[in-house]
A protein has these predicted regions:
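Short catalytic/ligand-binding loop motif for oxyanion handling, primarily in non-cytosolic enzymes
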Residues: 52-56, 108-111, 130-132, 171-173, ...
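Short, flexible, basic/aromatic active-site loop/helix in glycosyltransferases
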Residues: 140-153
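Catalytic core and acceptor-binding pocket of nucleotide-sugar-dependent glycosyltransferases
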Residues: 152-241
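A conserved donor-nucleotide-binding helix/loop in the catalytic core
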Residues: 24-26, 31-32, 73-102
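N-terminal anchoring/stem segment of glycosyltransferases
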Residues: 1-76, 236-245, 250-279
């Protein structure tokens, strides 16, 4: 199964003026890509020209089977400060199915039984917390935009840090509705609008087509023993930015794991300026 990493650099550039990645994000990106290739198949990075430049300068392009720059084509109407994860949606548009769509801070440690995952499988679903997943009246849309009346707002959202999608019709409906929503949002915050497009529309579109969604795990199980199969560092990032000791320990552990499992990449790691303090 081919996996897709994505990196749209526009959100960070708009926020900070330049593109950069934290040291721990560089390391999880490397570990995520290499572990997928070891256990589950090919993986590509869908990025933009700035992302390609960044990875080239650090000698990282070889961790993927391919690096493409289709995200240069994201239209200007998509606001990167609101839709900061739009690149992941567009990466599926440009890649098609079947595909495993995976965040760069998500690691799959072992071989997956893809035949058991059905037409669409997500890592876990989520409760409908009103401050994260508000109802339809919350959204301020451009004149003429109408939500599809078949969308079921009672469905639990899907966490899309990792999902496997085989059904072409579903991929086209989901990405089409997500892009239509993002293009027609009249402003909006960077949480509720983004997670609606990315995480709420997927189960809604699955239900519209009568496709059962397979939920791989749940938060309780992932917190209890998830590292046997999956690691997602999203929840640790703020802590690592605030705690230099925790950050250094995490980075050194990642480096040890990469050099133990993939010793041919040690010289690449040593050449990445952001990682030099850990050698």
């Amino acid at each position: 199964m081919e996996a897709i990493h994505s990196n749209w650099t526009a959100p960070r550039i708009k926020a900070d003026g330049i593109y950069y990645a934290d040291d721990f994000d560089i390391l999880t990106t490397i570990l995520s890509a290499l572990k997928w290739r070891e256990k589950n198949g090919q993986i590509k990075m869908v990025t933009d020209s700035e992302g390609l430049r960044y990875y080239n300068e650090r000698g990282m392009c070889g961790i993927w089977d391919a690096v493409t720059t289709e995200l240069d084509n994201i239209p200007d109407v998509i606001d990167p400060s609101v839709f900061w994860a739009a690149g992941k949606i567009y990466s599926l548009v440009y890649s098609g199915t079947p595909a495993a769509v995976m965040d760069t801070d998500f690691i799959v440690w072992d071989k997956l039984a893809f035949d058991n995952l059905g037409e669409i499988a997500v890592i876990h679903d989520e409760d409908i917390y009103p401050d994260v997943y508000p109802d339809i009246s919350h959204f301020n849309m451009k004149r003429g935009y109408v939500f599809d009346p078949e969308l079921d707002w009672r469905l639990r959202p899907s966490n899309t840090a990792f999902y496997v999608i085989r059904n072409k019709e579903l991929a086209e409906l989901y990405t089409g509705e997500a892009v239509r929503f993002m293009e027609n949002a009249a402003g909006g915050d960077s949480l509720t609008y983004m997670v609606f497009a990315e995480q709420r529309l997927l189960p809604m579109c699955s239900a519209m087509l009568g496709i059962d969604m397979y939920v791989i795990s749940n938060l309780e199980r992932l917190f209890r023993d998830g590292e046997r199969w999956f690691t997602h560092t999203w929840g640790m990032k703020r802590q690592m930015r605030e705690n230099t000791a925790l950050r250094a320990d995490f980075c050194r552990r990642c480096i040890r794991r990469i050099t133990a499992d993939f010793p041919e990449y040690e010289s690449m790691l040593r050449g990445i300026e952001e990682l030099r303090p850990y050698f």
